[in-house]
């Protein structure tokens, strides 16, 4: 009986140790800030999206305006750029070479396409949801409008209004935020409740 009890005790202890190891591994290696989930799942981008450091927009602007860095915009708007390049009879190889080059270098043709895209946008610009992970509080995700791509590839930052930083609990000390471009106008319309001015009042008091 003692032997059976000892064996059962060892079995229970082994199960307990395995459970403890699993919990600690998940906490330290998967769920922590440098963990696997943040590296490979939460930090992985969907198309078309981007993530970059934020800075304040210090030129005259609308409160819901967003200016994107050059290299980030080339990546996020690759499909849009390829669509225009195909109209001008670029081959797939030529498109790949041009977009690879312009990821880190300014190019007049790409800037012309960017300006054309914004000019043809049905709204104020291209609507994007803008979020600072991992915040999920009200107004942490806002619908802003991408109106300009910075022409200096050396500036790797998104710029947006000081009026929009409270909801996403952001500041300009190196914080990064992510932007996702809705795939069609129907989805953009459904996201309109995320506009910054719709979070100006408390949902419980007004």
Residue ranges: model-predicted function:
Residues 206:
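Phosphate-backbone binding interfaces of nucleic-acid-interacting proteins
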């Amino acid at each position: 009986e003692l032997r059976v009890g000892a064996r059962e005790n060892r079995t229970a202890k082994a199960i307990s140790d395995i459970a403890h190891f699993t919990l600690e591994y998940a906490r330290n290696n998967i769920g922590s800030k440098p963990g696997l989930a943040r590296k490979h799942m939460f930090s992985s981008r969907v198309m078309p999206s981007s993530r970059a450091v934020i800075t304040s927009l210090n030129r005259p602007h609308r409160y819901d305006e967003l200016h994107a860095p050059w290299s980030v915009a080339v990546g996020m708007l690759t499909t849009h750029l390829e669509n225009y390049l195909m109209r001008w009879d670029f081959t797939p190889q030529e498109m790949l070479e041009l977009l690879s080059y312009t990821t880190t270098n300014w190019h007049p043709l790409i800037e012309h396409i960017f300006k054309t895209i914004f000019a043809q946008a049905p709204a104020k610009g291209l609507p994007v949801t803008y979020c600072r992970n991992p915040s999920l509080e009200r107004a942490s995700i806002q619908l802003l409008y991408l109106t300009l791509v910075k022409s200096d590839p050396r500036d790797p930052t998104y710029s947006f209004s000081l009026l929009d930083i409270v909801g996403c609990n952001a500041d300009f000390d190196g914080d990064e935020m992510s932007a996702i471009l809705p795939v069609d106008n129907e989805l953009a319309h459904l996201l309109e409740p995320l506009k910054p001015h719709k979070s100006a009042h408390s949902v419980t008091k007004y």
